[in-house]
Curated annotation (Swiss-Prot):
Quaternary organization: Homodimer.
Keywords for this protein: ATP-binding, Biotin biosynthesis, Cytoplasm, Ligase, Magnesium, Metal-binding, Nucleotide-binding
Gene3D superfamilies per record: P-loop containing nucleotide triphosphate hydrolases (3.40.50.300)
Matching HAMAP family: BioD
NCBIfam families per record: bioD (TIGR00347)
Binding site for ATP: 13-18, 44, 100-103
Cofactor(s) this protein cannot do without: Mg(2+)
Principal EC category: ligase
GO biological process, one term: biotin biosynthetic process
Name of the featured protein: ATP-dependent dethiobiotin synthetase BioD
Native organism: Christiangramia forsetii (strain DSM 17595 / CGMCC 1.15422 / KT0803)
Localization terms from the record: Cytoplasm
């Protein structure tokens, strides 16, 4: 039965797009970013498509493409768009689906809804945690936010140079499966993504 993998992060610019490409490549899954705010000519969907080398993945259009690189609720207001989850329909596919969120879990979509509300309890969530001072707190808070919503199928991918004490603390206190860690690579291309895809495939299937 097809699965949905929701890729989120402990903040912005932590590596969600690269992770989305790796997961899509590993599982030959389809890809969808519901909301894109800004950079429409070089969107995350474009970036993922360039990084995925398998010929099976389908790349679905954004449900909502906003012009301003801001939090979705603010970007939607500038564009005069009423952004509501009830109007965001998941694409139909018979394959696994990778869904990339925008920013972190509590990024607002409107006055009542946040990114986390896009996640189904059946989704497998990949939380991307980049190492920096304060990342343990941000990671554990993100895990707590997911679990408080009844979302407990969570895997974590660390991003950046190895930090054993940080990773050990998150693993012990967060009680989530660690899929792996992405090194501070000089660049990402199809070959680098494919290497990580092969490395992470087994653990992705175990979440």
């Amino acid at each position: 039965m097809p699965k949905s993998y929701f890729i989120t992060g402990i903040g912005t610019e932590v590596g969600k797009t690269v992770v989305s490409a790796i997961v899509a490549e590993a599982l030959k899954a389809d890809y969808w970013k519901p909301i894109q705010a800004g950079d429409l000519e070089n969107s995350d969907s474009h970036k993922v498509k360039k990084l995925v080398s398998n010929k099976d993945s389908v790349f679905f259009k954004n449900a909502c493409a906003l012009n301003t690189p801001m939090s979705p609720h603010a970007a939607a207001e500038i564009d005069g768009i009423k952004l509501q989850i009830k109007n965001i329909k998941r694409p139909e596919t018979e394959k696994d689906l990778v869904i990339e969120g925008a920013g972190g879990l509590m990024v607002p979509l409107n006055a009542k809804e946040v990114i986390a509300d896009l996640i189904s309890k059946e989704d497998l969530v990949i939380l991307v945690s980049r190492h920096y001072l304060g990342s343990i707190n941000h990671t554990l808070l993100s895990i707590e936010a997911l679990k408080s919503r009844g979302i407990d199928k969570i895997g974590i991918i660390f991003s950046g140079d190895e930090h054993p004490t940080t990773e050990a603390a998150i693993k012990k206190l967060g009680k989530v499966k660690v899929v792996g860690r992405i090194e501070e690579e000089p660049y990402f291309d199809e070959m680098v993504v494919k290497e990580y895809a092969e490395k992470f495939r087994k653990r992705l299937c175990e979440i």
